[in-house]
Amino acid sequence: MSLNFLEFEKPIAELEAKIEALRDISRRGGDNALDLDKEIKQLEDKCLDLKKKTFSDLGAWEVAQLARHPERPYVLDYIELMFTEFDELAGDRAFADDKALVGGMARLDGRPVMIIGHQKGRGTKEKVRRNFGMPKPEGYRKAKRLMQMAERFKMPIITFIDTAGAYPGVGAEERGQSEAIATNLKIMSELSVPVICNVVGEGGSGGALAIGVGDYVNMLQYSTYSVISPEGCASILWRDSDKAPQAAEAMGLVAPRLKELELIDTIIDEPLGGAHRNHKATAENIKQRLIEQLNELEGFDEEALLERRYQRLMNYGYC
């Protein structure tokens, strides 16, 4: 069970703490233990009802907080839970290996695929090493190299998007951050193999879009996808980042709204309480959807696949 609770989850946290305390009393009592099963069951039922009520009516700001939860699964977690025979590939063959973006070959249900995804890292040292999941140009050029390799070997491409955005540092801009992102957009629109993109946490601006052009774009239930963070939007519009909750509601960054606008194709359910509550169940939900979509896309020849992707992209912005 997660030890990190968000502000709106505090009533749930208090109930779970009471349940754990009663269980502890029952365990330590030995032969003289009090029979607390009835009380524990009542609290468990109450906690379940509270979770259902809380998560059935989340606002955009609450979803944005869930998308950033520190215990949410990242691409390396999904690789371990969903794929076999993963072989990581490093470097852009020009400048460096960007640890904020992970990629390599693997098998999904026996089928060879290329995986590319943002990795935020856990713990201070790992977060710094991964640059908090914000790739530099060399990261996106690594992604380009792997996508072109996948095309040569006729391997479907699966991406996992979870970034606050592309790294905005001076060095990154000097090395051509915008060019690297733009090049990926062009290449992904022309790839002759199936491409499935999955927003599994934060989908932040061009940093997300640089590995987000595909035949299918899926979003986890409590992920976000937007041109800017709610805090950034609030700072620009109202000069006050404390108005981020209002900005989040106005931006339409949640999966149902994006599905309504046909900017994404599928919303993948998360376990009650969010993906961080059950990594395995979340991975299984994604895996099943990927298998279904790959089975469909592999029925298209190259010309039909590219035409389908072209029509999908041309529909953007149509209301």
Swiss-Prot record:
Q: Does the record carry Magnesium as a key word?
A: no
InterPro entries hit by this protein: Acetyl_CoA_COase_a_su, ClpP/crotonase-like_dom_sf, COA_CT_C
State the compartments where it is located: Cytoplasm
Q: Name one GO biological process term.
A: fatty acid biosynthetic process
**Keywords carried by this UniProt record:** ATP-binding, Cytoplasm, Fatty acid biosynthesis, Fatty acid metabolism, Lipid biosynthesis, Lipid metabolism, Nucleotide-binding, Transferase
> Which Gene Ontology terms of cellular component type are present?
acetyl-CoA carboxylase complex
Q: What is the protein name given in its UniProt record?
A: Acetyl-coenzyme A carboxylase carboxyl transferase subunit alpha
Native organism = Aliivibrio salmonicida (strain LFI1238)
